[in-house]
């Protein structure tokens, strides 16, 4: 654990007059809680680097649940997120902080996270496709395996024009009833491909990921979502979060 690791800060808060408590996501150790001693002091060279969305190299150690940051280097400047992409980045940071256990390795998820924030930094339209792809990747890494391509009841490939009801721990079963737990075969194929060519498939992806993530998040509201509603225009909020 004393070697250098690629990492991102998910969240930070003051720990003392001169130190920070960091929640970081690392390539090799997963999510780790660190104390950055002296990082808040006026002479600290770390203060500017230990920010969300800045690619870092970290070295840390210690035996307890809270490790001690030994060294930190910024690999590059922070990825340029602002407005809706900033709130989207805060959202995925909060997701990781809420659902990942400490010190559980998720190397592939680390690169999914990196790809997501890079996509957000370069987005010119809605960030929702990038968010939905990351949520689906996260669910997969958590062991939430869902077959989007076949009916769980008959085993037959899904049909674009048919409707399927989602049942937890079983999958999608053909249904004649249409409600917020049903999806068309076309929507399921889009979820499987993680490609959302229109508003219909994008809305379906949001419905599914919200249902699937709910058991991991519990009833506690996401702070990033509340911040988004508070500071972004109502029309934007309705488009992206409702």
Curated annotation (Swiss-Prot):
Q: What does this protein do?
A: Involved in DNA repair and RecF pathway recombination.
> Which GO biological process entries does UniProt record here?
DNA recombination; double-strand break repair; recombinational repair; response to UV
Induction remark: Encoded in the rnc-era-recO operon.
Q: Which UniProt keywords apply?
A: DNA damage, DNA recombination, DNA repair
State the GO CC annotations: bacterial nucleoid
Q: What is this protein called?
A: DNA repair protein RecO
Quaternary structure? Answer: Monomer.
Record's keyword annotation contains DNA damage? yes
Tell me which Gene3D superfamilies the record gives: Nucleic acid-binding proteins, Recombination protein O, C-terminal domain
Tell me, according to the record, the phenotype of the null mutant.
No visible phenotype.
The record's family statement is: Belongs to the RecO family.
Q: Which SUPFAM superfamilies match?
A: ArfGap/RecO-like zinc finger, Nucleic acid-binding proteins
